From Swiss-Prot:
ATP binds at G11, M12, S13, G14, G15, V16, D17, S18, M37, G127. This is tRNA-specific 2-thiouridylase MnmA. It comes from the Bacteria. GO terms for cellular component: cytoplasm. Belongs to the MnmA/TRMU family. One of its GO terms (biological process) is tRNA wobble position uridine thiolation. The active site is at C102 (nucleophile), C199 (cysteine persulfide intermediate). It is found in: Cytoplasm. Residues 149-151, 311-312 are annotated as: Interaction with tRNA. It catalyses: S-sulfanyl-L-cysteinyl-[protein] + uridine(34) in tRNA + AH2 + ATP = 2-thiouridine(34) in tRNA + L-cysteinyl-[protein] + A + AMP + diphosphate + H(+). Interacts with TusE. Residues 97-99 are annotated as: Interaction with target base in tRNA.
Length: 368
């Protein structure tokens, strides 16, 4: 008797990547069903969020492929485990990455549990551009084949057990191939542009959105030399390395370097700026990271040479990691790096393999 095909639940977002993922899995002989997750309740009456349109697109794709689409509402889990933490970080003057939190708490936790327990799935699948491979009996995370679209940075919190239960069909393809497949199949999502912005904000204006949940606290903008040159509307609206939107004009006569945010003094509600994108105050020799997640789930001890990204789409930076204690590491860069931002994630790689990462707690200044 032949074994019945394994059941996969694909997280259908209404985008092209998850659409093609579902079709690819059908071709590979899996029993495929879709699941649309609603993670945010629109309470503002304005059609900021495209959830309804995305659901309609996901349904149209599932109809075309002849697969069932389930829907689930994870808005409560999202609010408690992603959004509240996101606001807390902003209040503390840090710059969090909600997409990483969403993958950790919703897509590879709430969704994984729901698919297995309620829908009887053997696997879940998503449209992420990453690959998985087994190394010494443990599933490991690799960068996506399309270096331009690789999303391993957002998935570093996943452990080998979660990866073992997850499939990433488009991770083996390049984006133009994915669009071509969707076009050839006549899928409604073939030409849909990639979603940008944070999942719960959609394309809406970030400043307006944040201002609804956190009261703005205006304060001084001060240069590294201590001169007051303007007022900011709230530290939460600014991130290290930012140049636009400071409201202090570029330069007096156009000949000087523009102003960049180089630091935040949270205690005194002061934004600190300097001229030039390579100003020493903007550069770091390394960082301290905490809340570590290693894909192999082995504790890190000792020292390791590898590469790191301190933000998405950054070129890999050669570095050395030193264990400080169970949940903190010191990372020393081979060369100084600009705009290392507390609250963001530092993600480590050995070649194609994503090793894991942690939250940047502090940056290490250049030693003069």
């Amino acid at each position: 008797m032949s074994e019945s095909p394994k059941k996969v639940i694909v997280g259908m977002s209404g985008g092209v990547d998850s659409s093609v993922s579902a079709w690819l899995l059908q071709q590979q002989g899996y029993q495929v069903e879709g699941l649309f997750m609603k993670n945010w309740e629109e309470d503002d009456g304005e059609e900021y969020c495209t959830a309804a349109a995305d659901l309609a697109d996901a349904q149209a794709v599932c109809d075309k492929l002849g697969i069932e689409l389930h829907t689930v509402n994870f808005a409560a889990e999202y609010w408690d485990n992603v959004f509240e933490l996101f606001l807390e970080e902003y209040k503390a003057g840090r710059t969090p990455n909600p997409d990483i939190l969403c993958n950790k708490e919703i897509k590879f936790k709430a969704f994984l549990e729901f698919a297995a327990e309620d829908l009887g799935a053997d696997y879940i699948a998503t449209g992420h551009y990453v690959r998985r491979v087994d190394i010494n009996g443990k599933s490991r995370l690799l960068r996506g084949l399309d270096g331009n679209k690789d999303q391993s940075y957002f998935l570093y919190t996943l452990g080998h057990e979660q990866i073992a239960q997850s499939l990433f069909p488009v991770g083996e393809l390049e984006k133009p191939q994915v669009r071509k497949i969707a076009e050839d199949l006549g899928l409604i999502t073939a030409k849909k542009k990639d979603s940008t912005g944070i999942c719960f904000i959609g394309e809406r204006k970030f400043r307006d959105f944040l201002g609804r949940y956190l009261p703005a606290q205006p304060g001084k903008i001060i240069t590294v030399d201590g001169d007051e040159i303007g007022e900011h509307q709230g530290l939460m609206y600014h991130t290290l390395g930012q140049r636009k939107g400071l409201g202090i004009g570029g330069t007096k006569d156009g000949s000087e370097d523009p102003w960049y945010v180089v630091d935040k003094d949270v205690e005194n509600n002061v934004l600190i700026v300097a001229q030039g994108h390579e100003h020493p105050r903007l550069m770091s020799s390394g960082l301290i990271a905490q809340q570590l997640h290693w894909v192999d789930r082995e504790p890190f001890t000792g020292t390791l040479s590898c590469t790191v990204k301190t933000r998405y789409r950054q070129t890999d930076i050669p570095c050395t990691i030193n264990a400080l204690d169970d949940d903190r590491i010191e990372v020393i860069f081979d060369e100084p790096v600009a705009a290392v931002t507390p609250g963001q994630s530092a993600v480590f790689y050995s070649g194609e393999v994503c090793l894991g990462g942690g939250i940047i707690e502090q940056r290490l200044p250049l030693t003069v």
